């Protein structure tokens, strides 16, 4: 296990700042004292084939999606000593899920810019030929100066053409599209659905399809009689923005936005940005 003061190549670990099932993220500095976020894989035994493949695949896709603005900065990945690591830019800030929980004013004062930057980050991923497959507020960092970064590419895959079934069901059910939960063929439009769920949540502080498990979420998606439109929760939401969100949340993926650039364009028009 990684520990405070441990040296991994040119990096010294200082403080654990986040932890997930597969890895732990540390604040680290290099020999020049510059800060980085170092993600250390927990289970790096000789038999952790699947975990290592997923870790490295996510790192490679992240590297391919670098844009210098909306995607978390990639530095390097590989084995340092006995540990499998991914070194990233360090962003001093918080994710959108935590900002929602804290009732941070940025989600009211600057929500238009947050939504547009969030969508633009997703557009970058799709333009590079990948689907993220884990779009949600928790995977979007907002720095103290307001810059946004999309993170966590562990589940990302190349966009299939035509759509195909995923090998396994991974992700967070509340943000999964119906075709995902039903284990039907998918493509990048599952990300567009997840963005719609996230936008609804950021604007209303409620989930559009609440449920204790995947089956309940799926039932709510299919039975729209219980669905509450965003403007019925927050009357300040512009009608055109509501229309965009509802288009992202179409049950039939063919009725959602076909490409993310159209979503970005319409969103900018709706928000006058």
What are these regions, as identified by a protein language model?
Residues 45-64:
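AlphaC helix of the eukaryotic protein kinase fold
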Residues 77:
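Activation-segment/catalytic-loop signature of the eukaryotic protein kinase fold
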Residues 114-115:
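Activation segment signature within eukaryotic-like protein kinase domains
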Residues 120-130:
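Protein kinase catalytic-loop region centered on the HRD/HxD motif
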Residues 204-208:
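Structural helix C-cap motif within protein kinase domains
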């Amino acid at each position: 296990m990684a520990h405070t003061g441990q040296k991994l190549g040119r990096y010294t670990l200082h403080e654990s700042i986040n932890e997930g099932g597969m890895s732990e993220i540390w604040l680290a500095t290099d020999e020049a004292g510059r800060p980085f976020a170092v993600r250390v894989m927990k289970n790096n035994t000789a038999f952790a084939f699947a975990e290592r493949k997923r870790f490295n695949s996510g790192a490679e896709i992240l590297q391919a999606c670098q844009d210098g603005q909306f995607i978390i900065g990639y530095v390097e990945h590989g084995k340092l000593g006995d540990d499998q690591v991914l070194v990233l830019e360090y962003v001093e800030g918080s994710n959108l899920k935590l900002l929602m929980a804290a009732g941070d004013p940025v989600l009211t004062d600057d929500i238009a810019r947050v939504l547009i930057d969030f969508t633009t980050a997703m557009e970058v991923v799709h333009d590079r030929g990948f689907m993220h497959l884990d779009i949600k507020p928790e995977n979007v960092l907002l720095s103290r100066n307001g810059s946004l970064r999309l993170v966590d590419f562990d589940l990302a895959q190349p966009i299939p053409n035509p759509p195909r079934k995923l090998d396994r069901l991974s992700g967070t059910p509340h943000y999964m599209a119906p075709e995902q939960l039903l284990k039907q063929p998918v493509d990048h439009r599952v990300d567009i659905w997840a963005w719609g769920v996230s936008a609804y949540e950021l604007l209303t502080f409620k989930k559009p399809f609440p449920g204790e498990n995947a089956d309940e979420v799926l039932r709510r998606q299919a039975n729209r009689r219980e669905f509450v439109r965003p403007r019925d929760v927050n009357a300040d939401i512009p009608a055109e923005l509501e229309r965009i969100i509802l288009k992202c949340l179409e049950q039939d993926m063919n009725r959602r936005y076909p490409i993310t650039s159209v979503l970005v364009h319409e969103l900018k028009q709706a928000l006058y940005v």
